[in-house]
């Protein structure tokens, strides 16, 4: 006798898909996708599906902010520590710019969030740069010395 839970056994014994969500997340996803494909919209676990969609949107925004903060931190280090510039810093900047470029291509609406969150991300990046360089927070410009366009430009590095 197999103890494995399958979509069919759960669906036949449990009509409430919210229970599947709590017991086996991957099975719940597969079940919801199948119900959508089959057009069985009345059976969809709407509350949990909405929660998951909200989480996906939040994850996209969190990733954007994290990538932006890393770019800004490395640009600040590059600007303020010219004697320590390294290819690894340039590679990190390139890698995270590329991630943002891909995110914007997949979800153009993230560009609005980028514009809105830029000042806040700069403040976080400034703190990160202060910690990693050992410099005072006041050693860094109060507002970003880099434009939003420069931060995204694949070829831009401060002098």
Language-model segments: residues:
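Surface/interface-facing alpha-helical segments and adjacent flexible terminal/loop regions used
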Residues: 1-159
């Amino acid at each position: 006798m197999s103890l494995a839970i399958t979509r069919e056994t759960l669906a036949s014994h449990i009509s409430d898909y919210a229970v599947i969500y709590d017991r086996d997340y991957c099975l719940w996803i597969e079940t919801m996708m199948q119900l959508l494909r089959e057009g069985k919209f009345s059976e969809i676990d709407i509350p949990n599906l909405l929660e998951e969609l909200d989480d996906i949107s939040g994850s996209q925004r969190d990733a954007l902010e994290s990538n932006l903060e890393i770019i800004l931190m490395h640009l600040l280090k590059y600007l303020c520590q010219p004697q320590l510039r390294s290819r690894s810093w340039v590679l990190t900047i390139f890698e995270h710019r590329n991630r943002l470029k891909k995110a914007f291509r997949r979800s153009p609406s993230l560009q609005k969030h980028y514009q809105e969150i830029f000042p806040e991300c700069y403040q976080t990046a400034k703190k990160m740069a202060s910690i990693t360089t050992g410099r005072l927070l006041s050693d860094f410009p109060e507002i970003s010395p880099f434009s939003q366009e420069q931060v995204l430009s694949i070829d831009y590095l401060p002098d």
